[in-house]
Amino acid sequence: MLTFVGLGLYDERSVTVAGRDAIRDADRVFAEFYTSRLIGTDIETLEDTLETSIERRDRAGIEQDPEPILEAAESEHVVFCTAGDTMVSTTHADLRLRAADRGIETRIVHGTTAQTAAGSLTGLQNYRFGKATTLPFEDAHGGDGVPDSVVATIEDNRDRDLHTLVYLDIKVDDPHWEESDDTYMTASQAATMLSEPFPDTLGVVVARAGSPDPLVAADTLDELATQTFGDPLHLLVIPGSLHPLEADTLESVAGAALE
């Protein structure tokens, strides 16, 4: 059996009780942290808290060589973990389908995601979010500025009067990324990049969702580009038009100066 467990947003306490129990009951536990991280903890603390040994896999070990996980799941109870939810944004549907093709039973234990936290913290209504996008570092996509696909996603959402959740690039355990380079894109870096195609546009920063000290800030992208927002992880939201309740919440919790 292969159980997918989302670990939540921040530290070893973010996992649900159901997720914790599944991990403790497993014969083997695998995890990946190349797409997102639990910033408030480390692998050793996770292992101590969850009373298990965690076998960490890199991107190639999940996408190109999943055999160790699948072979173990054919005869043992195996858990595969990620930050957030294993099937939301950081999707591992391919691994689940490979397991199903081999007759391996699968189960999903959901975790809190950045998508739900962004709506909760900002007061932006969840059903008014359109397609999300990820903003990569310029050096990561081999071009200058913002990729056309990111611009198109934001423009399409704005045409439909929808909010856009922008995930910010993470380069952790990436063999193609120099250790001296940034590993976590900051909201100010993202605002700098996006302010060119979207001048005079409102942005909403969400930093450290799920932690004891989350931060929410709203201003124009040009202004956000000049500010700092502390430790990662950061998200950026480009809102559509605001419902009065959304506007009131951003003014109250994010310091937005809305006309």
Swiss-Prot record:
Pfam families: TP_methylase. It comes from Haloarcula marismortui (strain ATCC 43049 / DSM 3752 / JCM 8966 / VKM B-1809) (Halobacterium marismortui). PANTHER family: DIPHTHINE METHYL ESTER SYNTHASE, DIPHTHINE SYNTHASE. Keywords: Methyltransferase, S-adenosyl-L-methionine, Transferase. One of its GO terms (biological process) is protein histidyl modification to diphthamide. S-adenosyl-L-methionine binds at residues 9, 85, 88, 113-114, 168, 209, 234. Belongs to the diphthine synthase family. This is Diphthine synthase. Its EC number is 2.1.1.98. It catalyses: 2-[(3S)-amino-3-carboxypropyl]-L-histidyl-[translation elongation factor 2] + 3 S-adenosyl-L-methionine = diphthine-[translation elongation factor 2] + 3 S-adenosyl-L-homocysteine + 3 H(+). S-adenosyl-L-methionine-dependent methyltransferase that catalyzes the trimethylation of the amino group of the modified target histidine residue in translation elongation factor 2 (EF-2), to form an intermediate called diphthine. The three successive methylation reactions represent the second step of diphthamide biosynthesis. Homodimer. Pathway: Protein modification; peptidyl-diphthamide biosynthesis. One of its GO terms (molecular function) is diphthine synthase activity. InterPro entries: 4pyrrol_Mease (IPR000878), 4pyrrol_Methylase_sf (IPR035996), 4pyrrole_Mease_sub1 (IPR014777), 4pyrrole_Mease_sub2 (IPR014776), Dphthn_synthase (IPR004551).
